[in-house]
Swiss-Prot record:
Protein name as it appears in the record: Membrane protein insertase YidC 2
Annotated lipid attachment (S-diacylglycerol cysteine): C27
Keywords for the protein's UniProt record, in alphabetical order: Cell membrane, Chaperone, Lipoprotein, Membrane, Palmitate, Protein transport, Signal, Transmembrane, Transmembrane helix, Transport
InterPro entries: YidC/ALB3/OXA1/COX18, YidC/Oxa/ALB_C, YidC/YidC1/YidC2_Firmicutes, YidC_ALB_C
MF (Gene Ontology): membrane insertase activity
NCBIfam families noted in UniProt: yidC_oxa1_cterm
Gene (UniProt): yidC2
Amino acid sequence: MKKKKRFKQKLLIASLVIGLVAVLSGCGYSTDPITKDSTGFWSHYIVFPLSWVITWFSDLFGGNYAVGIIVVTILIRLLIMPLMIKQLKSQKAMTSLQPKIKELQEKYSSKDNETKQKLQQETMRLYQENSVNPMMGCLPLLIQMPILLGFYQAISRTAEIKTDTFLWMQLGNPDPYYILPIVAALTTFLSSKISMMGQTQQNKSMAMIVYIMPVMILFMGITLPSALALYWIIGNIFTVFQTLLINNPFKNKREQEALAAAQLEEERLKKKAANMKASKKGGKKRK
């Protein structure tokens, strides 16, 4: 059962990696300038609206396209916030259910197929009763993939954005000093680490994502426009504050430690009571 779960988790991680690679592959799909007359569903309904919104906010801030990208990034994060809140609540519920799941695993510890199937059914029933979706954690990431590709094309196909400068770099080119990619990787790690804090050991089997994602972001940031690295940095900072406000992992960790201590104390008292009972029985027999 554990091996099967590990395989599924590795498969999920591989799928996410392949998905990001697919995003990279798609980045060069079209280089035609984007306008309101651009044809095709992707260009007309995804890339052009992103380009238009970035340009509109940039004009609002005196033609500063970096500020436009920052504002649009925050707006996108606000739009997907309901999903992120649901994800955080699902993570918290999953963590609180771990003792019950452990009990089920001990109850159905046999290796035969019938028992394994029963364990799966009981686990799914437990999830349904508590409105928990184990796959919910992947949904926000999957939604952000097309947004990332749309952002890339909006930048590379809009001359005003592509040629605008921010600090020491041109938004359409990679950061020549690798500062933004490094900051993007560090904030990705911080965001992922904070999200994973307070989770149980079983959930931590997915913790390799915490280390894989920053490395991927670093390499992507080195080769892709600096505007994308800026998008990642702002998005990661937003996620950190969002997690701390909605589902504070430090508070959750303290609660879990207190619960674990209470459970240990309860077990200690039960053992003490059982030992005292056994001692009394032994004393009566000797009499």
